[in-house]
Regions:
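Beta-propeller domains
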Residues: 59-65, 76-115
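Beta-propeller blade signature
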Residues: 95-102, 142-152, 184-195, 242-254, ...
Length: 406
């Protein structure tokens, strides 16, 4: 190692070393030290990279507005190949807004061709084998419709002679769904259609406490290589855990659907409006409107609030006249949204419909001179039809170790 004059010096490991810049170390063999083989040396360069971002935190970035001219309302979003597609009813017309995952700053509005959905959102929509599959809101005919681009739709032959009520979730080799047989709703999958693996009498009957709509699902692979589905949604009667209404996930490991009711109120996920479930960094997460926090679980049974580092953007409102911006974003209080997970790049996309957000926050009571009591303050702000994406910093570091964290 060079000293201040540029000459070689011997390192004393008890000394402190400045590692803010790369340093060169020269290692001498015993022969080189003895002078018998002076060329038997080797040089090493040590460079220590210090991340400027906490690896356990979510990093959020504003991407774009879905539309600057159209008012986006209730929406459903899905990924097809390298594209993100968001469906929304605008001025009583169903439209799809499309952007590339690699260029989500640019969104193109499209009217649907051969539109079977009329002026309503699909009741269920998913991506499987480079196609989209969806059911209509009224679904009187029990048909499923398919599309290769999200714009032009036609009746799907994959579900021929089936009366499908609702699509649930895809795995690598099949789509799971609910169908009606002799006025009874049962669980089924597309590989059972093609292989006749089960007779109608062998299919699992859909229980009364299974979600009836607004399905959110996530897929995952276990340590042993088994594919699974975890699913949540709207219930005819919301489940109860102790004294609170709770979200009860349903799981599927290739054969039957099983509920995951919480053991008690303390380990339950409280009911949320329009909840979303995702499997991210080997954990299950649930969040919903108002965007107060994530709830997390290792196996889908016991839930708790996620670490504060794994959170949505929030700001300090103590300054007078503070208003959120794209540079200082605030998610609390927001409502109508949709979300998709880009598994390839580990991005969590959240797409908002524009609106006015309002939330309450506990602050110090200004009238309390001793500052020992709390008061509740309401904050209100407006936001646009925005696209945001977040990623855990550690996953960012892993994908780009040379540049991440800078």
């Amino acid at each position: 190692m060079k000293d201040q004059s540029g000459k070689d010096s011997i390192i004393n490991i008890a000394d402190s070393i400045d590692l803010r810049k790369p340093i060169k170390l020269k290692v001498w063999s015993t022969e080189a030290l003895a002078g018998t083989s002076p060329d038997q040396t080797r040089e090493y360069t040590i460079s220590v990279r210090v991340h400027k971002h906490d690896p356990d935190s979510l990093r959020w970035n504003y991407v774009a507005n879905i539309s600057n001219s159209e008012s986006i309302k209730e929406q459903k979003t899905v990924i097809l190949g390298e594209n993100i597609l968001t469906y929304s009813v605008v001025d009583n017309v169903l439209k799809v807004y499309i952007a590339q995952k690699g260029n989500a700053m640019s969104w193109v509005s499209n009217s649907l061709e051969e539109n079977p959905f009329k002026n309503s959102l699909p009741s269920s929509i998913l991506s499987y084998n480079n196609k989209l599959y969806a059911t209509t809101a009224d679904n009187n005919d029990g048909n499923v419709y398919e599309s290769t681009n999200g714009i032009k739709w036609e009746t799907s032959g994959l579900f021929e002679n089936e009366h499908v009520n609702l699509l649930l979730a895809p795995l690598s080799n099949k789509i799971t769904y609910i169908k009606t047989i002799n006025e009874t709703k049962v669980f089924a999958s597309t590989n059972e259609i093609t292989s006749n693996a089960k007779t109608d009498q062998e299919l699992q009957v859909v229980p009364d406490d299974f979600p009836i709509g607004n399905i959110s699902y996530t897929t995952y692979t276990t340590a042993t290589g088994l594919e699974g589905i975890m699913l949540i949604g709207e219930h005819a009667k919301q489940p109860i855990a102790g004294d609170i209404e709770a979200i009860v996930p349903w799981g599927y490991m290739g054969s039957i659907w099983v509920s995951f009711p919480p053991n008690n109120e303390e380990t339950s996920c409280p009911v949320l409006q329009t909840p979303t479930i995702m499997y991210y960094n080997n954990q299950f997460y649930i969040f919903g409107e108002k965007f107060e926090s994530f709830y997390t679980s290792e196996a889908g049974l016991a839930w708790k609030k996620a670490n504060k580092k794994f959170s949505f953007p929030y700001q300090d409102w103590s300054e007078a006249d503070f208003k959120p911006s794209k540079e200082q974003p605030e998610f609390r209080g927001r409502e109508t949204y949709s979300s998709v997970l880009d598994d390839k790049n580990d991005y969590i996309y959240i797409l908002f419909s524009g609106g006015t957000a309002s939330f309450e926050e506990e602050v110090e009571d200004e009238e309390d001179e001793e500052k020992s009591s709390k008061a509740t303050k309401t904050h209100t702000y407006t936001y646009e039809s925005e696209v945001w994406r977040g990623r855990l910093n550690q996953l960012w570091f892993d994908k780009d170790p040379l540049n991440a964290g800078k």
